[in-house]
A protein has these predicted regions:
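Inter-helical turn/loop segments and adjacent helix faces that build the functional surface
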Residues: 137-144, 270-273, 434-449, 527-538, ...
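Active-site acid/base region of carbohydrate-active enzymes
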Residues: 320-334, 383, 388-397, 423, ...
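Short strand-turn-strand beta-turns centered on an Asx-Gly dipeptide
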Residues: 800-807
């Protein structure tokens, strides 16, 4: 069943009925001001940090679902009937409805009682505000006497405190109203230098800022007393719950339209200029008033929206393909690339499954997100790399998470997730291959953001490698610490306290026994990439006469020797006969072995081992892939492990706390599926790689939306596995490493167009029934027009560049 369709020309997904299985959302903003918006105008906004700078309030797990957002109410003043153009919150049946989610914008259009409403929501580039551009049209043959009410609910800034500390928060809310603009200034009188504002372009018949006066006692958003009676209370919030609502009266002739613009924004003042007059408690509005005046002008709004569309045309134009498969084209050309931008901005902080109050930006998560984003805005990728490295510990370890507003490590979670450091070298290598910016290696970066501790980024990478080498267990494999990539495989926690967080629970074991085969294969991959980087750096130095070594980087022999030694250890202690083991627990017993009663085979080490080159020369790579296909593959994707854990195992931790088939306990954890796709491509299995790609491809699953339930235009983190009655149902959409890794799998390994130090590599491994494809790739400022034609049954490439044969499969960089 479909709830909409892809509008490929406009790069939009068009939702045609409001009651989708779950809220189908979009993101507004791409720089500092962000918003989440659902197909019925639910969601919230924040500045930089979804916890510490939450602008509007949102209640997760609410009943009814997705109540609270950017709401408009239309009222027919002649009859008293009112409705929501976005369907929610009144849920009045509409005569027509569409929601168009586009690149950084959403358009909701509907009609009821021959009155149509169309609202465009977006965040202008370079502005810390969002625009609601609303057009109301009278389609009747008589005059329409209407009232339009806007509504947002302000959050008291810290979203966690806002949702928990009522004894204080019911007493602190403050607003100002001036020239029809509602200013939210809670705590501005003391510690804060920022405020929010809500403005309207039309003359007002009234306003409200106090929730209870707007709604009425014991009423909800679906039936506000102010809208019901058609008159605002002109309330001013003094404590309790502050809101923003404008009342605009409209008299429309037959066929007449009226455009009203609403602005919701964030503003900071210099601390010594907070008040005007200085000795008052009145917000200094000298800086914000010109901004409000500018963006309330229709011509400014139209120009800003055109700029946003052009911005995304440029971003998406960096990589465009035309393949025989429509779902692939949609994901590569538009939706997967778009999701990579969103995950770069959000990491795992704010979605409809992540409340924005806990995780901030993850070290591992953000390092992987860079892999699918680095070609889009390299300058921002560079900045993120340096921010990540600055949270690294002096011993090479890393904070698991850091807050985007402060860029400091999260002490509550801390470090000890022992795979974290190894993702940084992979991110840096991807960045340098894309940009050729070797100078980043010489950038001075502190540890734990402590001034005076700076070393070149190259040394941070070396310390990341050494962190693994300095933390090996009894078999010579890396110690797992608190966890590795699978945060729920907690081999040292032994938690038996109800409600205790596995991520912050104290270690019950000393951590000197439990080892991770996954970290071992990841280490081999990272060490080999560091060796190749070292060789390239030394080559550049040797080719530049009299050049002083600009940064310190170990010789490639160091990394190759470390990788070779780890490979020997893996074959001795990490191979189970037909697949790679997952780990050794705190008692030295195998995890992910045929000897185990449950959890005999895990997906994670299989694909990454092949990416690291293990087993390619002796058939064991193909044997591991065959085991994955036989034991883990389902019609909806590849499950994380089998058999699922049927009960809680104290020594395994959170992974066994989930019911079978959900999350880390044998769901289709989509993040890991592209590792297998890449592995299949590396061994030359184009059909199998693409088959796995299509199984979890959102656009290919659009026809089973009643089963999949999440958005058909973006990846979800997890799909219920075959051990669960809800097999095929997705959860945790949008913010997942699945986005970056699937983008890498399809664009760089199946289509085979990937950056290298020396040029653009063309090495497709496509399905046998494809006769070829075309692509456009902008790489280091040069536009490459690529035509791939199948001339046989293999994957060997004969490269022709500008009409001339070129040896190998790398298009050399222009002279």
């Amino acid at each position: 069943m479909r709830y909409g369709y892809f509008d490929d020309k406009n790069r939009e997904y068009v939702i045609t009925q409001p009651d989708t299985p779950l809220p189908w959302i979009n993101y507004l903003g791409s720089e500092a001001y962000f918003g989440l918006i659902s197909n019925t105008a639910g969601g919230y906004s924040f500045y930089r940090d979804a916890r510490l700078r939450r602008i509007t309030r949102y209640r997760y797990n609410n009943v009814p679902l997705d109540f609270g957002g950017r709401y408009l109410y239309l009222r027919d003043n002649a009859t008293g009937a009112f409705w929501s153009p976005s369907w929610q919150p009144t849920r009045t049946p509409l005569d027509s409805y569409t929601c168009r989610h586009g690149m950084g914008y959403t358009i909701i259009e509907s009609a009821n009682q021959q009155i149509s409403a169309k609202t465009l929501y977006f965040v202008p580039l370079g502005a810390n505000l969002e625009i609601w551009s609303t057009t109301i049209t009278n389609q009747r043959d008589t005059v329409a006497d209407l009232s339009l009410f806007s509504l947002i609910e302000f959050c008291l800034w810290d979203a966690w405190d806002d949702a928990t500390n009522y004894q204080r928060n019911f007493n602190i809310a403050q607003v100002e109203i001036e020239d029809g603009v509602i200013y939210h200034k809670t705590e501005y009188r003391e510690r804060r230098d920022h405020f929010a504002y809500f403005a309207c372009s039309a003359p007002l018949a009234g306003y409200d800022t106090h929730r209870e006066d707007f709604l009425g006692p014991y009423r909800g958003w679906d039936k506000p007393v102010v809208v019901e009676r058609g008159e605002s209370a002109n309330s001013e919030a003094r404590s309790w719950a502050p809101i923003g609502s404008h009342h605009v009266k409209l008299t429309l002739q037959p066929g007449e339209s009226r455009r009203i613009i609403f602005l919701l924004g964030y503003q900071e003042n210099p601390r010594d200029q907070k008040f005007d007059p200085p000795d008052s408690q009145i917000i200094n509005k000298r800086l914000v008033k010109p901004i409000i005046a500018k963006y309330l002008q229709p011509e400014t709004v139209d120009a800003a929206f055109a700029d946003l569309r052009a911005y995304w045309d440029g971003i998406l134009g960096i990589y465009q393909v035309d393949t025989p498969d429509m779902a692939t084209n949609r994901m590569v050309n538009v939706w997967n690339a778009y999701q990579c931008m969103v995950t770069f901005n959000m990491s795992r902080s704010a979605s409809y499954f992540e409340s924005g109050v806990g995780r901030g930006l993850g070290f591992r998560d953000s390092s992987q997100d860079l892999l699918g984003f680095v070609h889009q805005v390299p300058a921002r990728a560079r900045e993120r790399i340096l921010d990540l490295a600055a949270t690294q510990l002096a011993n090479g370890g890393a904070y698991h998470q850091f807050q985007p507003l402060t860029k400091r490590g999260n002490d509550a979670v801390g470090s000890g997730f022992n795979d974290d450091p190894l993702w940084l070298p992979l991110a840096v290598v991807a960045y340098i291959k894309e940009t050729g910016d070797f100078d980043i290696l010489n950038a001075p970066v502190p540890y734990e953001n402590k001034p005076g501790t700076e070393t070149p980024l190259a040394e941070h990478l070396e310390r990341a490698i050494n962190y693994t080498l300095n933390n090996l267990g009894p078999h010579g494999l890396p110690l797992i610490g608190r966890a590795d990539w699978n945060d729920c495989l907690n081999l040292n926690i032994f938690s038996d306290e109800p409600g205790e967080s596995f991520q912050v629970a104290p270690l019950k074991k000393d951590g000197k026994v439990a080892e991770s085969v996954f970290i071992a294969v990841l280490f081999v991959l990272a060490a080999k990439e560091m060796a190749a980087l070292s060789d390239k750096v030394n080559q550049r130095i040797s080719e530049s006469a009299n050049q002083v070594l600009p940064f310190a980087i170990r010789h490639s022999h160091f990394y190759l020797d470390a990788a070779a030694k780890m490979e020997q250890t893996i074959w001795a202690h990490g191979w189970d006969g037909a697949w790679f083991l997952r780990a050794y627990d705190a008692f030295g017993e195998k995890v992910g072995s045929h000897e185990c009663a449950e959890g005999q085979i895990f997906i994670e080490p299989q694909g990454v081992a092949i990416m690291a080159g293990l087993g390619l020369d002796d058939g064991r790579a193909e044997l591991a892939l065959a085991s994955v296909k036989e034991r883990l593959a389902t019609e909806h994707g590849i499950v994380l492990q089998q058999p699922a854990y049927s009960r809680y195992y104290l020594h395994l931790g959170e992974i066994s706390s989930y019911p079978p088939g959900f999350k880390e306990n044998a769901s289709i954890f989509c993040h890991t599926n592209p590792w297998i796709m890449i592995g299949e491509a590396i061994v030359g299995h184009g059909d199998q790689a693409f088959d796995y790609y299509k199984r979890i491809c959102p656009a290919a699953r659009e026809g089973i939306s009643e089963i999949h339930r999440c958005e058909p235009y973006v990846y979800a983190q997890t799909i219920a596995g075959r051990d669960n009655p809800r097999h095929g149902e997705a959860k945790n959409s949008w913010l997942t490493g699945t986005a970056a890794w699937n983008y890498v799998a399809i664009t760089q390994w199946i289509l085979g167009i990937r950056p290298s130090y020396d040029g653009l590599q063309i090495a497709p491994v496509i399905p046998m029934d494809w006769q070829g494809f075309t692509a456009t790739r902008i790489f280091r400022g040069v536009t490459y027009h690529i035509t791939v034609e199948r001339q046989g049954g293999g994957n060997t490439v004969s490269l022709v560049v500008d009409g001339k044969p070129v040896e190998g499969n790398i298009v050399p960089l222009p002279a």
